[in-house]
UniProtKB/Swiss-Prot annotation:
GO cellular component: cytoplasm
GO MF, any single term: 3-dehydroquinate synthase activity
PANTHER family found in the cross-reference section: 3-DEHYDROQUINATE SYNTHASE (PTHR43622:SF1)
Cofactor: NAD(+); Co(2+); Zn(2+)
Enzyme Commission code(s) on record: 4.2.3.4
Subcellular location(s) of the protein: Cytoplasm
Residue sites binding Zn(2+) per the record: 166, 220, 236
Underlying gene: aroB
Protein's UniProt name: 3-dehydroquinate synthase
Cofactor: binding comment: Binds 1 divalent metal cation per subunit. Can use either Co(2+) or Zn(2+).
Amino acid sequence: MEGLSFGPLSILPSLAEELNPHRVAFLTNTTVERLWLEKAAEGIEEPIRIVIPDGEKYKSLETAVAIWKRLQEEGFTRKSLLIGLGGGVVTDIAGFVASTYMRGTLLGLVPTTLLAQVDAAIGGKTGVNFNGKNMIGTFYLPNFVLIAHETLSTLPEEEIRNGLGEVAKYALLDRKVYALARNFEGISETLIRECALFKVEVVEKDLGESGLRRILNLGHTAGHAIEKLSNYRIKHGLAVSMGLMVASKVGEELYGFDSGKTEELLKKLGLPTGHPFRAEEILEEMRLDKKAWYGRITFVIPVEIGDVVVEEVDEAVLKRALEATRDDSGSGDCQKPGGSA
Ligand SMILES: NC(=O)c1ccc[n+]([C@@H]2O[C@H](COP(=O)([O-])OP(=O)(O)OC[C@H]3O[C@@H](n4cnc5c(N)ncnc54)[C@H](O)[C@@H]3O)[C@@H](O)[C@H]2O)c1
């Protein structure tokens, strides 16, 4: 597994030096360049600076081509180090470019959003969008990931909440994360560390995503459908939060799971506990997804905190869970989380 380090940006030069690279290039976007590139590059000799526009739509092959070209012009080699500094969009493209340029260069990731620190930068999945999200990509483990808590100090509240959706997911999957999250008073280094380490542990057991890694889809089956139905107005993390509530209701009916624990947790984190759609609309969206995956879409169901099963669920059960979690009062808005970063 990749070397996961927790510490300030000032340790980046020593992480880079350990790899003895020919050259170092930073890949970042316009927003993170302004906020963090100078600090990250301190102590690294004449790094190449590649800055892409900010936004999911730039997670594209066109952007990858532009980066490959620039690396070639700069004489970047397989023994050079590409450092992706940014949110999940940047870390996904950095991984993709590093895995494909000259069949693979050295790669370091410095995730700067909560979502990227607990999820996107961990586990070796890289990619770009191409007629669909993440349609072109590779599995490529970075040489290091540096989780620098300080970078979250500039992250907007909305992006913190986006990441908290994934934190809530880990809390249902892991008792240690649950214990921290239910007493949430702001994003702590410990909470991020426990989430990140949990993902590392799962991924280490299943890099190719054939088995255990599927548990990381908890909340995502209904969540994706909700995200799509809202035309992506509902952000990923909030849709996942709604999806966790749906999955918990399914768990309650099938395995006696206490969905009140999920509700309490989501409220503590300032996340929505209900979705704004009709059950039939979400089911229809899920059926489309199921078709896209050759009818093999399964559901991750909480049995108790720290324990889930992965199985197909009868539509009637799903429908009841979707009806029980509908909240058309305010399209999933909710109170602020118990503190800030
Ligand atoms: N590879 C994986 O396993 C995996 C897992 C989950 C998500 N993803 C991908 O991650 C992407 C979403 O990641 P994201 O939520 O980080 O989005 P993002 O990268 O678009 O970042 C969100 C916003 O925050 C800004 N930002 C980043 N760091 C900042 C900082 N420190 N201060 C202020 N602003 C900052 C960005 O410029 C952007 O505007 C999606 O493309 C998704 O497919 C990948």
